[in-house]
Amino acid sequence: VVVDIPKDVSFEKTAYKGYPQSVEMRSYNPVRKGHGGQIRKALQLLLAARRPYIYTGGGVLLADACAELRTLVDLLNCPVTHTLMGLGAFPASDRRFLGMLGMHGTWEANNAMQHCDVLLAVGARFDDRVIGNPKHFAQNERKIIHIDIDPSSISKRVKVDVPIVGDVKDVLSEMIGMIREASARPDQAALADWWKTVEGWRARDCMKYDRANTDVIKPQKVIETLWEMTRGADAYITSDVGQHQMWA
């Protein structure tokens, strides 16, 4: 059981009136299977997209939908990014992974978010570390598809065009089946142009640093050294919360 209390509520003062005699709570029965019509609408947008982009959050991991995500990316051949909580859902070694996005993310991941024409959000909540000021988010015209098991998370911060309420694993499985049965396929020429643009952003190499400067310890150097020391080992690495967590 998780009790989530907003910050403004926790700061308020009130008078204690004792415990209630009884507490009645309605059961939680989430919708697991996505609406077929909404999934078809989403596929129409994705297959017709010239600059598709997949944005995933911790919901993919919680739903054990990593395999389905990888299959979908294979079918669409589009770039994918994660939030902090979604890291690990898609292999970081895959060229289609652009790294984490948001205020602590990569140049290519954030630019792709701002320039895509169809965005598929999967198990993510568009938090402020990702979108910043909602007024300045989605400046370019684009369609947003949002898959989430919690209906209250959809269109909460960013208005979406195709909401799909359901379990991420079930919805992605249904989506994959529909793509395989469909006659339409992504526009490969448009995708090639999109990837050319993405690779231009990636070429900036936003995480690079001056290796010749040994006067200060760079976070990148620390992470690289830690990687070399633990590569191939069955190692567990933990991190405190803060800027160093973002580097880790």
Labelled PLM ranges:
Residues 197-248:
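Active-site diphosphate/adenylate-binding microenvironment
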Residues 53, 61-74:
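Glycine-rich phosphate/diphosphate-binding loop of Rossmann-like nucleotide-binding domains
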Residues 38-53, 72, 113-115, 225-235:
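Glycine-rich phosphate/diphosphate-binding loops that line cofactor/substrate pockets in enzymes
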Residues 1-45, 206:
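Conformationally flexible catalytic loops at phosphate/diphosphate-handling active centers
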Residues 5-11, 58-60, 151, 241-243:
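Glycine-rich beta-alpha junction loops
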Residues 2-6, 55, 121-123, 148, ...:
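Short beta-strand segments
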Residues 4, 77-84, 145-148:
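Short internal beta-strands
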Residues 86-197:
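Glycine-rich, acidic loop regions that bind phosphate or pyrophosphate groups
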